[in-house]
Amino acid sequence: MMGSHIDTVKNAGALDGCYGVLAGLAVARAFRQAGIRPQRSITIGAFTNEEGIRYQPDMMGSLVYARGLSVDAALNTVGIDGTRLGDELARIGYAG
């Protein structure tokens, strides 16, 4: 697995976290262009909610991936503004 997080805070570093995601994509592309077929599957992760500003706990995306939190529990999390994460993901077209 390769990847990182994509920031969810307003004044984060310009490319903080995105470098890891882009590096994973670059490796996969380089392998493909060179005709290299890895012995194992490559997974590229682009996790969200690393900081946990609006929805707790922090690092929620990677926590769900590692099975430390169920998808249902994450989607039913209520944020500091009273919104439910699953509803907000649907609202912005990120559900599913």
Language model feature labels by segment:
Residues 2-5, 11-50:
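Alpha-helical metal-binding/catalytic segments enriched in His/Glu/Asp
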Residues 30-36, 70-74, 87-95:
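Generic secondary-structure signature for well-ordered alpha-helical cores
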Residues 1-10, 81-96:
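Soluble metallo-hydrolase cores and metallopeptidase-like ectodomains found primarily
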Residues 13, 18-19, 23, 63-64, ...:
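Solvent-exposed, flexible loop/coil residues
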Residues 49, 57-89:
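A glycine-rich helix N-cap at a beta->alpha junction
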Residues 10-11, 50-56, 96:
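Short, well-ordered, mixed-charge alpha-helical segments that flank or form enzyme active sites
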